[in-house]
Amino acid sequence: MTSTNTRNKGKCIVEGPPPTLSRYESQKSRDWNTFCQYLMTKMPPVHVWECESNHILDFLQSRDQFGKTKVHIQGCVFFGQKEPPGECNCPLKQAWGSLDALIGRLRAAYEENGGLTEKNPFARGGIRIFLREVRGSQAKARGVLYKKKKRLVVVGTGTSTTWT
């Protein structure tokens, strides 16, 4: 493989094949393209710079069809059990961690594609609340307890600390 370097207005440009993307960068690009295509299927089509929280929430819920995590419904005999002893007909959904990672990649891709940080729809409070609710409901359904992290509070001049 040969490549040549040329000068262009003080910037060195390497000609040749594009660099290989990392797994994260490839996934981020795929996620961005999938989201943009999803918006174009809306009636009327929505441009990515016009999308709102409701479009993102609809997209996240549409991802459940590809989920692999069994989430027991309230009336299921296995609801709240970590390791249920049998099978049930409860739905498969996207795991909270997968949705959280997806939002992180889309948040980064939005800004890398020219979106303003302060207008990033993937960083809005409604999206964070949705993810928190999914995390809580999936944890409850699967018998997993998440403990809130305790905050360190510095009292006085910093010589003593207390945990709350």
From Swiss-Prot:
Keywords: Developmental protein, DNA-binding, Nucleus, Transcription, Transcription regulation
Principal location listed in the UniProt entry: nucleus
One GO MF term: DNA binding
Pfam families for this protein: ALOG_dom
GO BP annotations listed: mRNA transcription; post-embryonic plant morphogenesis
Residue interval(s) of motif Nuclear localization signal: 148-152
GO cellular component, one term: nucleus
Record-annotated ALOG domain positions: 23-150
Subcellular location as annotated: Nucleus
Domain of life: Eukaryota
Classification via InterPro entries: ALOG, ALOG_dom
Family to which the UniProt record says this protein belongs: Belongs to the plant homeotic and developmental regulators ALOG protein family.
Purpose of the protein: Probable transcription regulator that acts as a developmental regulator by promoting cell growth in response to light.
Identification of the protein by name: Protein LIGHT-DEPENDENT SHORT HYPOCOTYLS 8
Species this protein is from: Arabidopsis thaliana
Gene from which the chain derives: LSH8
